[in-house]
Amino acid sequence: MASMAAVLTWALALLSAFSATQARKGFWDYFSQTSGDKGRVEQIHQQKMAREPATLKDSLEQDLNNMNKFLEKLRPLSGSEAPRLPQDPVGMRRQLQEELEEVKARLQPYMAEAHELVGWNLEGLRQQLKPYTMDLMEQVALRVQELQEQLRVVGEDTKAQLLGGVDEAWALLQGLQSRVVHHTGRFKELFHPYAESLVSGIGRHVQELHRSVAPHAPASPARLSRCVQVLSRKLTLKAKALHARIQQNLDQLREELSRAFAGTGTEEGAGPDPQMLSEEVRQRLQAFRQDTYLQIAAFTRAIDQETEEVQQQLAPPPPGHSAFAPEFQQTDSGKVLSKLQARLDDLWEDITHSLHDQGHSHLGDP
């Protein structure tokens, strides 16, 4: 029942958010057409008041039954003919809004609870993936330090070679170029398992999320499964893209360092300046590390963003929350209508599933 209540509360809140958009007139006209005349609405209201429930559960079941009929009329939001307005559309709309607010006030606590529980599980996923990104950053720092040590050109021995003559300088630079190729290749080999671990960790922990969030999400099992699969696919693709970008960074670093050790100046009879060469190496390595850190940080932010979107889809916050229905604050009424249609389709699926389960539950009662 709590799951169904959260779904219904979101439906009511969604309608409230939608009524503030540029397309609200068409929506209410459509409702006026499909809901029949005013007398029928008043009759439903009088029946509802006459059967005032003694408990919250009875009240919720009655509201759910009424909303099931109400939502059937919300399915088609486009393609209808010109609406036929009732005699008093303003009064009907006011009465409907009052009833919606009454039901929403009763059910809102369930929505807040579901939002909190789903959010807690998604935060658990973020914390589970954090060590993987920390490992990536630690590996970058470690391998950059290793490259720095292998490409030192300011020691006494290397300085003497660079300044000793063209042949000696050329031999040293060729050796440094070989080190660049070797150690950047080694970097790739050592980094690969960590990137693969991130991908496999995403798949494993998202499946754990699926199991842990299922008891709390108002969404139907089918929609929950779709949301989880989309989340897993998105994060996996982003993790693979991150690995590819780091590989590209390494290729670029190898090319830049190889050019730096190309022996500029040896053809003129003088070797390169050791201090200048060392500074260039340092700058190249620092730029590589900084760029890679930024890309890993961007991936971490993407995890936060994707999980927040899943929370909005599975258990949106109650009305009044700062994150409530941000997509409906746009000025483009066409986009708002499209998103509202998609959201109502999701709600319809969830409500149908919940009512189906509720019906089976009643059939099983002695």
Swiss-Prot record:
Tissue distribution: Liver and plasma.
Induction remark: Up-regulated by PPARA agonists, which are used clinically to lower serum TG (such as fibrates).
Keywords linked to the UniProt accession: Chylomicron, Coiled coil, Disease variant, Endosome, Golgi apparatus, HDL, Lipid transport, Phosphoprotein, Secreted, Signal, Transport, VLDL
Other information: Induced in early phase of liver regeneration.
Species name: Homo sapiens
Coiled coil: 54-157, 236-262
MF terms (GO), sorted A to Z: cholesterol transfer activity; enzyme binding; heparin binding; lipase activator activity; lipase binding; lipid binding; lipoprotein lipase activator activity; lipoprotein particle receptor binding
Signal sequence range: 1-23
One of the record's GO cellular component terms: very-low-density lipoprotein particle
Noted disease: Hypertriglyceridemia 1: A common inherited disorder in which the concentration of very low density lipoprotein (VLDL) is elevated in the plasma. This leads to increased risk of heart disease, obesity, and pancreatitis. Inheritance is autosomal dominant.
Stated name of the protein: Apolipoprotein A-V
Modified residue annotations for Phosphothreonine: T55
Family classification: Belongs to the apolipoprotein A1/A4/E family.
Subunit structure, interactors included: Interacts with GPIHBP1. Interacts with SORL1; this interaction leads to APOA5 internalization and sorting either to lysosomes and degradation, or to the trans-Golgi network.
